[in-house]
Amino acid sequence: MGLSEDIALFELNLNELIIKYEQYFLGLEKREPLKLLEEVERYVRKYHGAHISNTMLKFKFNSVVARFSSYKQYWNRITRLIE
């Protein structure tokens, strides 16, 4: 798979992860979606240090990573409040 397909899958998995966490916080899901979280983090680690020469793909990747980081901070904060 190429970089553009990986970024598209990364974004799709992130959107699914957002939905799963909202369901978890509402009580519809019994467990935190840790497996999907690991899968999304794997995309971040895979391309974190890699050189992306296409500026459009670099911008897209960085914006999805920034979105993931802000959601992850939010999820950690809410999870700590629940505990």
Question: Model-found features: residue ranges?
Answer:
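Eukaryotic low-complexity, intrinsically disordered regulatory regions enriched for acidic, serine-
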Residues: 28-79, 83
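Terminal low-complexity "docking" segments
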Residues: 1-34, 55
